[in-house]
Amino acid sequence: MSDAGEAPAVAATDKPHRRTLRAAQDDYTVDGLRLKPAYVEYYRQLQEIVELAVITLSKQLDIREVQEVYSLARQLYEILRGQFVDEPFKLWLETNASRLAADAEFKKSMHKILQDQLQTLTAKTNTFKNAVLNVLNNELSTDANLYDTSAGYIKPNCIVTTFTCCDLTFEP
């Protein structure tokens, strides 16, 4: 699924399930998928949001075991990876990824909103996925009326250009 004529430099290793790429790690997802250039900053900000959510939720839910925290992070990542094209959070993050990277006050404000809402969330009973998506879709965007949710959401668009099925090591 790679673009024609565009292949990263791959170094051979002694293990067939491992691969070393001579590429920037920021250009790839945690699963080794190569990001489309337009989505590198989007993905970087998404990672920070997931990290903040994991820290907040693990504290609120008193999760102390490393495996449980890792499992929580994977669940959040899978939820966010399945975001639909027109869900408010995905649209908001696409629009604001550059601003989050450049404006420290804006980022601090958005992270505070997310943290406060996730703390409130843990007091309610709801499924984990629905609760997290509700916070992301309704609390960060100040103009949720722009998004018509009555007809459901559109299938996710792909933010990566390649698929890699092995463990990756990155070299500068």
UniProtKB/Swiss-Prot annotation:
Listed InterPro entries: AcMNPV_30.6kDa (IPR022594)
Domain of life the protein comes from: Viruses
A Pfam family matched in the record: DUF2704
Protein's UniProt name: Uncharacterized 19.5 kDa protein
